[in-house]
């Protein structure tokens, strides 16, 4: 995957998000990933999903998540979160997100999220406009080979 299409930010694991063992609670990983992705959209793409929703009555909703937990993220640990668009399709976008330790030597979690383009007025999915496709297509970062989530996870484990 091309590095210039992989966006990243940092986060600190906070106390209210942890379980009694001081590990990030499994349900909170997705919150950290989605918050980072929103930041990535606004900072790197200069695209606010909130302004888009307000102006167009359209946005994206999560249609599917696949997540693997590899190592615990610990209380007050600084982590690096990356995101990249794997596939831009007619009605949805597949985004890969990873959570790493601060040095990016230990992968803590892998998430694939399918974001479905959604029309608030009709309550149904909506095709991406030509303008959106033109805007986001340059950021698409497909894997060299079309693989399943499990195969991707195995690739990453074997490369570390």
Where are the predicted features?
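Functionalized membrane-embedded alpha-helices
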Residues: 79-83
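Short, charged beta-turn/beta-strand-edge "cap" motif at the junction between a beta-strand
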Residues: 85-88
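Terminal targeting signals and extreme-terminal segments of soluble enzymes
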Residues: 1-78, 90-94, 98-160
């Amino acid at each position: 995957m091309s590095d210039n299409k992989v966006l990243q930010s940092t986060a600190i694991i906070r106390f209210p998000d942890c379980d009694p063992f001081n590990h990030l609670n499994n349900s909170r990983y997705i919150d950290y990933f989605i918050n980072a992705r929103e930041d990535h959209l606004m900072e790197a793409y200069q695209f606010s999903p909130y302004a888009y929703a307000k102006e167009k009555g359209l946005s994206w909703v999560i249609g599917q998540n696949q997540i693997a937990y590899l190592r615990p993220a610990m209380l007050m640990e600084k982590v690096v979160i990356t995101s990249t668009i794997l596939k831009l399709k007619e009605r949805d976008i597949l985004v890969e997100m990873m959570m790493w330790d601060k040095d990016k030597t230990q992968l803590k979690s892998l998430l694939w999220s399918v974001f479905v383009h959604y029309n608030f007025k009709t309550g149904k999915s909506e095709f991406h406009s030509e303008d959106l496709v033109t805007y986001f297509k340059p950021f698409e970062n497909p894997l060299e080979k079309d693989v399943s989530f499990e195969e991707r996870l195995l690739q990453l484990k074997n490369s570390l």
